[in-house]
């Protein structure tokens, strides 16, 4: 049973709760980004690799590359702004939760990604990418709040190891779904069964991410409110980036 008492900074419980978000979200980077979704996407367009978009025929691989690049542009632009707003409001947990829910539900929505829903599927892929990387920004910003400087390397390593273990476990399960669909009661032709199993793997990623992140959210603090003038909220994050850049220049 979870205790309502919030653990103190530097405590093993709080550091483990923070690191456990790696267990929750790393399945996205392994299953969606690396292993299964690229195979599903390629198989989807094996007969016709062209996507009609805004009056142009675009190759499917180029389309996903453009969409990924555009998502990273959006993330790089909004992240400092969101960081400034979160610092002003003192509630970065809410921002992190928003992007976790955005990403996880978008992954679940990929279940319906097929040739009849190309644009919806690509949009969900885009939202999942935004949710994943934006949530990591707030997740990483929590490290100084949960661990003292001498603990931070160990805490990061713990998160990395948990993420590796968790993502491999789910990947192995998803691969078993795809390779042995009959064992799990998935019917149809071999190709239909594999396609359906891949879709189920996207749902598994979304649910895994959504459910296990709740452990981190239960224990993580709300966030400390920083004293920032309202007129400086929007550009506060950019100013912090500049100060980091100046510090790097000074030391290197």
Predicted regions mapped to residue ranges:
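Helix-loop boundary and gating motifs at the non-cytosolic
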Residues: 5-72, 118-122
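Cytoplasmic helix-loop-helix junction between adjacent transmembrane helices
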Residues: 124, 130-161
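Hydrophobic core of transmembrane alpha-helices in multi-pass small-molecule transporters
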Residues: 100-138
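Juxtamembrane intracellular "pre-TM" segments in multi-pass secondary transporters
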Residues: 2-16, 221-252
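Helix-loop junctions on the cytosolic side of multi-pass membrane transporters
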Residues: 145, 181-184, 213-229
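Cytoplasmic membrane-interface "Motif A"-like loop-to-helix N-cap segments
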Residues: 86-102
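Symmetry-related core transmembrane helices of the 12-TM Major Facilitator Superfamily/SLC fold
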Residues: 195-218
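Glycine-rich segments within core transmembrane alpha-helices of 12-TM secondary carriers
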Residues: 156-179
């Amino acid at each position: 049973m979870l205790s309502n008492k919030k653990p103190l900074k530097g405590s093993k419980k709080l550091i483990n709760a923070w690191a456990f978000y790696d267990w929750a979200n790393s399945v996205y980077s392994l299953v969606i980004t690396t292993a299964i979704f690229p195979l599903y996407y390629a198989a989807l367009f094996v007969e016709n690799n062209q996507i009609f978009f805004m009056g142009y025929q675009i190759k499917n691989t180029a389309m996903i590359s453009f969409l990924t690049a555009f998502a990273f542009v959006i993330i790089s632009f909004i992240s400092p702004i969101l960081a400034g707003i979160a610092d002003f409001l003192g509630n970065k947990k809410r921002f992190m939760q928003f992007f976790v829910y955005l990403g996880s539900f978008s992954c679940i929505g990929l279940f319906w990604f097929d040739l009849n829903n190309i644009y919806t599927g690509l949009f969900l892929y885009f939202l999942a990418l935004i949710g994943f990387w934006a949530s990591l920004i707030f997740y990483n910003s929590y490290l100084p709040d949960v661990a003292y400087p001498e603990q931070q390397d160990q805490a990061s390593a713990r998160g990395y190891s948990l993420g590796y273990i968790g993502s491999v476990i789910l990947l192995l399960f998803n691969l078993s779904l795809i390779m042995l669909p009959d064992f799990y009661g998935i019917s149809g032709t071999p190709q239909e069964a594999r396609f359906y199993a891949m879709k189920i793997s996207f749902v598994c990623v979304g649910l895994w991410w959504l459910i296990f992140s709740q452990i981190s959210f239960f224990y993580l603090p709300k966030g400390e409110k920083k004293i920032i003038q309202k007129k400086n909220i929007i550009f506060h994050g950019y100013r912090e980036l500049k100060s980091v850049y100046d510090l790097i220049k000074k030391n290197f």
